[in-house]
């Protein structure tokens, strides 16, 4: 088309040419919208880059975090108990359930009740997958499963730990060394 025919068409209002211009207008508007979207995305990304990236991650995850009741991450507690009767043993079990380490000093108890108390607390410790350790004479450590107990002390030497070679009277071996008399009294040797 020539320039004159185009001018006539514009002045006369030819529909054919108007459609062409409309398409061109829409294309230019789409291009402008794409540029505006790019500018908005650029502003949003700058806002995210200026903020702390850990805050962004924490905001998404904080809604899914649920605390466990009875468990504190701050510090561990140790409960030292010197019970005088078996009636005080449920307190030790409750402390273990609260994830506290319990040290029982049973020197003040009757030996039969002390044995019963150790059995009771050891059963409770086993039920919660805990650990138990004998620390000293009538002193015991009971710990929940969240506490690791390591012992660097060698095993105590006691009469039950000593093994002696027992020979049967029908044995063919001849033993020329006498058996040690560790458990015998010196007075009984002279009489």
Curated annotation (Swiss-Prot):
It is found in: Cytoplasm. Belongs to the SepF family. Residues 153-191 are annotated as: Disordered. The keyword Acyltransferase does not apply. Its main location: cytoplasm. Pfam families: SepF. The keyword Cell division applies. One of its GO terms (biological process) is division septum assembly. This is Cell division protein SepF. Cell division protein that is part of the divisome complex and is recruited early to the Z-ring. Probably stimulates Z-ring formation, perhaps through the cross-linking of FtsZ protofilaments. Its function overlaps with FtsA. It comes from Prochlorococcus marinus (strain MIT 9515). Keywords: Cell cycle, Cell division, Cytoplasm, Septation. Homodimer. Interacts with FtsZ. It comes from the Bacteria. PANTHER family: CELL DIVISION PROTEIN SEPF. Residues 153-178 have a biased composition (Polar residues). GO terms for cellular component: cytoplasm.
